[in-house]
């Protein structure tokens, strides 16, 4: 049976054997019979007005005359008005449906009127969206939601393809209507409207990639609210029968699909884009300019059966010469196009039938063209000029440019997705379901890998070419990795060599490569592997002129340009063996001159290497050969060795030194230095060192002229009057005044200018700096990092020996400057500062002074454990000393003691030691560095907890020894020690004595306020205090902060009483301990035997003789002056026994000074 469904409504049910036809439809059913008859199914009249259903039976075999008869019958039915719309209740509407339709009519009426050429969507305020071709999906059950109830209809266990067609309409606030068609023998499952929204994707190709490709966001054709409405498709079953979609779907430009299927099968149809449909129409109508099958998006507009693979396509079936290709109604072996040119795909046992053109497939009047192949039906050319009576003629237009653009976009999207999809394996879930051979996959992967490698090679080729362009290095790179002698060096420059005399031969051997590691980041120059090079263009003049008052100021000025990593000083006696250092020492010793320094920098390059101990650098052949000759020990470090630094200074060829390995080490250090350069700024530097008379400086100050500004003006640095707060008259005097100064200019890098005062000459010099740069600022690292581990300790000992043997000693400075350096005097003239409070805290020196020595302690005698006890040394040369630790509880306390002076004593070195936790039973020992001995220090034993002070003890170190020890006390848990060391040849060292005392300790007595015990630390006889402190340790340290005091200088004793604080309860008392430590100086030590002492002694003696009638009782601050009275004959000197006792309490001691001989010098 062949059924043609001319549905004018979106709602109807299946038709099977001419039975049960739903409302509002005209159906022509043709049976295989011997005669043609038109008879109503439900009405007696042959042509009643607006009949519902008719059947047209005849014999099965189609032919051309049967086609003509069928077409004439259909045309006649249309002329008699049988294709009119019928309302839901079966009544015939008025003749003029267009006039009877109101804006409030149902969507079905609006769709009906639009289909037969009535008012358009704009007039009816409704929008019509054409059908789209759909795909078939296997489902097991359908859930249908009506306006009244929800019904579930389970299907058979086997998957039944079901086709759902939707029409979309949009109206204000309306819901979506969907109608599902099912088998004819089932009852209606849907009577109302389903309140659901279509979720069909608009993209024509998304369903091909649903296995792993995410869906695109839905893009509606209409703006505003959209609704979907379903139009049913008729089904028929039986051998050799074929199905056709309704003619009304043709009017709506919807592709109809008819399939040979079992009667339990259903299909689900999703809408497709209007642009896609118009593209197919244009192609079927044969409009010029349409693309071929291979380029049109219609080529991919096909349904995919999810349960089977496609076996043949239309082109293959036509090429085989299938006899059914031109059959109008199809045959038992395949599907053919219907009379209106629709191509239908059918599925039977996993086989896809071929599709052919139908009646209107090639005619210009065909409303749609859904076939993938151009129809070969001869009726297409015969009826080319016949108008389609069932469609709106205005909607049949050729493909627009916009539709063609949409088609190309769809084709482009498909081509973009196809390669991605083809990369997937041929798994059963894959969309194409093709078994790809493994060899093909391997070949494809191999080709893809070859393309990737080729692309990488093409990308890397320009980079390698860029790297090969870098062929030069920066001019000053040869200084990087060079050795440096910190004792003989001088970054400012040497007057004789006009350069830094500390630069030594290269130590590091660099490797270069033209790659990303061997070329600078700007791809201009080569750089060492593991290092870096970059341009650094900067020329600046110092904003301020530095006034150098002493050797410490000079050393600090040099350390700005040459320092260890982080800016710390290089080491002992740094730069002291250079000519510039000796000259400045002579100049600064003169009290009638003032020295100033001004620097100008012009930097061009910066270079550096990685400063890591884990990086093994390559060294030069000469350095490696020198290291191989070094022994593993340094003989002079042995106390029994007779070759000391003093012996080497006096006679290095003496037998005491030649029999040792000391010459080998000294030769190695003199050749390669003590350090090596790891970072440098290369360019030029011009240093002005100006010396002016003291009287000249005082005269300028009296005139109101700023000395530093005047020097800048004379040196060409700044304009007159800059930075001065004087009157205009004084400014005029400043501009007219010329200082009488002695100027020395040192130039490093570039071509030295002829006249350093000429700006043009200075500009020419700055231009030559880039071609001839030299290190103007650099950082160094100790050379022992490049030595084997077994030789590093010996190298450190050798460097200390070298610094003392070659550099200036205190005796040398005394002889050079004519000023006696005496350690007790220097310490006595310093300022003591004691601070207490919560940790960390800090103690600060008075203005203009820096730290000479000191310590910071963290104490807690209430909490158990030993982690609450810490001690560190205060770094010299800084303005303050920071505490140690943090306050984790209210009983954590800090104590800081520092000694401040105008300049640090570089020869003093501090040592701190702590015992491991719970090691109180072991003796703690600390040693001074090489060639140094103890000046003073103390050791303390402590224990945590409220009763820890019961085990507290303190001991002093012995002056002149190289080791200081602290023996534990009973019950102690931790020992810590602090001491200071100095060169054993330092003047006045033998005058000092250390004293430590533990006073009252035990339970605190709150009734004895400020008198709870005492501590009294006394100096030995004939000595006075140089420095020291007294302190009270308490269970609650926060309540005794005021009981931490420094001892008065020149006094004979230092004492303090307890505060009397007890916060214990019942029989639990707080503990406390009072203790102190002092350094005393003796008064019977002869003065230093130097020539200047003789002159001062005679002068002082004459001066004293002139003071007749004066009280001969000397104040404590006159003790040292009295020591130098009459060096030629014995003198009586009064020394107070206790400075606090007043002038009436004094003890006299006579001492006889040894005669001074010039031969002793």
Curated annotation (Swiss-Prot):
Residues 154-329, 353-381, 716-736, 1094-1149 are annotated as: Disordered. It is found in: Parasitophorous vacuole membrane; Cytoplasmic vesicle, Secretory vesicle, Microneme membrane. InterPro entries: MACPF (IPR020864). The chain crosses the membrane at residues 67-86, 554-589, 694-740. Residues 238-249 have a biased composition (Low complexity). Residues 264-283, 1099-1111 have a biased composition (Basic residues). Homooligomer; forms a homooligomeric pore. Belongs to the MPEG1 family. The MACPF domain includes the central machinery of pore formation: acidification causes a significant structural rearrangement, leading to oligomerization and deployment of transmembrane beta-strands that enter the membrane as amphipathic beta-hairpins. This is Perforin-like protein 1. The gene is PLP1.
